[in-house]
Amino acid sequence: MEGGFGSDFGGSGSGKLDPGLIMEQVKVQIAVANAQELLQRMTDKCFRKCIGKPGGSLDNSEQKCIAMCMDRYMDAWNTVSRAYNSRLQRERANM
């Protein structure tokens, strides 16, 4: 068994680590973790808002509430994300 990160990081097989490849893999892992956290938060908030008495199935009003809640949550998240990215770009341009 090899080290904790496996052999994917070497790239050329020479045993040297490729910093660019490592950065890309870290970025992918961060993006996946962020998506999982977003989904978990959205699920928790919408469940608490829409499901009064958990049962074997969702009634029609609960289904509509969940769908609308998730749509609003994603819209809000996208709006905040765009504003944040725009601000980061402006700040980078001013450096």
From Swiss-Prot:
The modification N6-succinyllysine is found at K53. Pfam families: zf-Tim10_DDP. A motif (Twin CX3C motif) lies at residues 46-69. Keywords: Acetylation, Chaperone, Disulfide bond, Membrane, Metal-binding, Mitochondrion, Mitochondrion inner membrane, Phosphoprotein, Protein transport, Translocation, Transport, Zinc. Disulfide bonds join C46-C69, C50-C65. It is found in: Mitochondrion inner membrane. GO terms for molecular function: zinc ion binding. Ubiquitous, with highest expression in heart, kidney, liver and skeletal muscle. Signal peptide: none annotated. Belongs to the small Tim family. Heterohexamer; composed of 3 copies of TIMM8 (TIMM8A or TIMM8B) and 3 copies of TIMM13, named soluble 70 kDa complex. Associates with the TIM22 complex, whose core is composed of TIMM22. This is Mitochondrial import inner membrane translocase subunit Tim13. It comes from Homo sapiens (Human). The lineage of its organism: Eukaryota, Metazoa, Chordata, Craniata, Vertebrata. The gene is TIMM13.
